């Protein structure tokens, strides 16, 4: 991942604007420690903090078109860049200057104006600026895998940034940029370009009704999603918790790792053995499960430990990077923050991870309490649309804190087209006769193999019950966080919580403590309003941990 900042149509004197932009951009340098670049016109400026993954030698940004009248700053990856490049070259109108996967955006903008973002298959946030027309376009990927914020300055300028910290002090108003939208200077409005039926509030089309249709469709689409995200010119690995989602990702990567996906597996990969990474408290449930999967897949496995006290000590830094006070997100992000530091120290810049599956397939244990298939589907849609505030935010900012990029194949557009058009009855946690079955049954079933075929995963892993990441790294982690909050927040202080925080008042001491830490770095209502809180729709709402759900207790007693 990279860090981008854009200030457009500013009234600030040019030299002062440049100094300010460079200073603010440095707040994003953790996201892109490899190089930084800047483009400036008379009243607008684009900056870029680069993490080089593809096109290492000549992919520095901002990128410019042939006559240098259009500039582009991008954070993300475009997975269909080869096809886009091929089609653009075939028109005879464009000359590519770099091997960057993002350069097609420039030329699509030249050809199609604002109406091209739907053609991109990838995870991205970008701003493209047209010097001749003094116009711009900003956009964010369909689900919000990559962060982007928009702000408004009192002089009328509009600002964009990968993280809130670069714009919070200068903009009187700012907010997360909505996923699946673009914003054009021509209309100064958000326009939704990503409009599948499920995200627009419609029921699933029900195209895939029988298991005979569903199972191969899931398997094929997901395998393609993983392979496309193996595109890299640097060492990469997989985050492996030992749960279903990360294990499936690791299994598919291991099947394709020996050949370079960049040339469609025509040549041997120079990093053929996959490195897998796991973290937890000693004796945590995830550690043994991850070791078992790594042994089965023959990955080069790296296991790291942390203590509860180390996690508590890191909380202010974690909250600074995450820009949230949501309890669930902070609990899960702290181990990931530690792990990303270890990964970067090994020289690895990119990892694949399993975020998104629980939202798509109803994998959280509270989904066992869904009243019917329709409500189950509605909740899946709601969770996916909120991912940019929770798991996507956690995965991106925890890793980007140390200059590591995370890729999430479950949120591939083509895979979503399949998974969200399955008849919801295949996803619910009981069969047609009302008999209970494990969460994400249909995904697990899709990766079962026939006799004589090499299994993707051992049965013990394929059918292992869900552990929320913050639970799986060690049950005493959450208990330690609660105990710490009890010690840090007095009963008297907590009793006055409404006077401290009249808006979105914390309901637990742990939430109160994180809110205090957040407000110390990001004060004011504008910052607070960028945050959402993760609360289960059914079941225990005061404690979002998976352990608080009765179905978890019934399987562990």
From Swiss-Prot:
CDD domains per UniProt: Asn_synthase_B_C, AsnB
SUPFAM superfamilies assigned: Adenine nucleotide alpha hydrolases-like, N-terminal nucleophile aminohydrolases (Ntn hydrolases)
Occurrences of domain Glutamine amidotransferase type-2 (ranges): 2-188
Site (Important for beta-aspartyl-AMP intermediate formation): 355
Annotated pathway: Amino-acid biosynthesis; L-asparagine biosynthesis; L-asparagine from L-aspartate (L-Gln route): step 1/1
Pfam families: Asn_synthase (PF00733), GATase_7 (PF13537)
Residues bound to L-glutamine: 50-54, 75-77, 101
Record GO terms (molecular function): asparagine synthase (glutamine-hydrolyzing) activity; ATP binding
Catalytic site positions: 2 (for gatase activity)
First-tier enzyme category under EC: ligase
A single GO cellular-component term on record: phagocytic vesicle
Keywords: Amino-acid biosynthesis, Asparagine biosynthesis, ATP-binding, Glutamine amidotransferase, Ligase, Nucleotide-binding
Region (Disordered): 538-557
Protein name per UniProt: Probable asparagine synthetase [glutamine-hydrolyzing]
Organism: Dictyostelium discoideum
